[in-house]
Amino acid sequence: MTDSACSRRKIVARDRLHLEELIKDAIEKGGPECDLNFIDVSNIMDMFGLFDYSSFNGNISEWDVSNVTDMGQMFHRSAFTGDISRWNVSKVCSMSGMFYDSAFNGDVSQWDVSSVQDMRGLFSGTPFNGDISQWNVANVEIMSGMFASSVFNGDIGNWDVSHVKDMSYMFVDSKFDGDISHWNVESLLDVRNMFRESEFERSGKSRLWLNRVYQEFLDRSKDSNGRVIALNRDRLENLIDAAMFLNGPKCDLNFIDVSQVKMMFDLFKNSPFDGDISQWDVSNVECMDNMFTDSLFSGNIDAWNVSRVESMYEMFDGSVLEKLGKVPGWYKE
């Protein structure tokens, strides 16, 4: 089909709602492969979910997106495969799920992503396998699920990931098997299931890489007196994951100072942990809901000070402690 069906003079999109109306009208008149370059989007800052679940696969190569800050889920589960290689994305802060489960496999090698902080799920479930080796990801903090279930196996070994805190599920079920041995992971907190069922795991590389990451994490979690302090539930969960990975499910976790943690809900839910936490100072904990639900934990925690706990809902339901009749005497649902 010719472009004439929806080609016209430039129309400035006043705001996000106006942009959506222009796109809808153009597609209705010209079909999903029409040319949308007649729309001036230079005033638009928010493009979150703009083509979410869309059949659009036309031309937006000339769009001026230089003021856009949010491209999260922009092409989420869409049919789009067009050329956006020349886009100026230098102000974009979020690309969360931008191409999630989409058909996109285009060239984005020259994109300036230096302002992006959130790349979670960016290429998850896509056929994308392009060159992004030169991307400046120095400001990215979240990469969870970034390449999950994708075919990506490009070179990202020189990326500066020193500010990334979350890489959980990053390569789960992916084809990635590259060299990331030189990554600086000084800020990394969460690597849960990072390589699960991936080629990286099957190649045997994940154990060595995670061993280094977890050990570094524990080392930098120590204070000046050598104590490992958990400031909150999330940090505590990360410390537990690290200790169990390095030392197994029967490890001693009494080295973790939990005196500042207030929330412990679901902490060992469905967990294989069966080590020692008898010396934990839980005197400031307020919620222990489902803490050991369906867990294998069978240790002695009778001496815990739970005087400030307000809720213990189903704390031991389905647990080994319940089955053995060893639920602590202080437990009150």
Give residue spans per PLM region:
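Negatively charged
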Residues: M1-E333
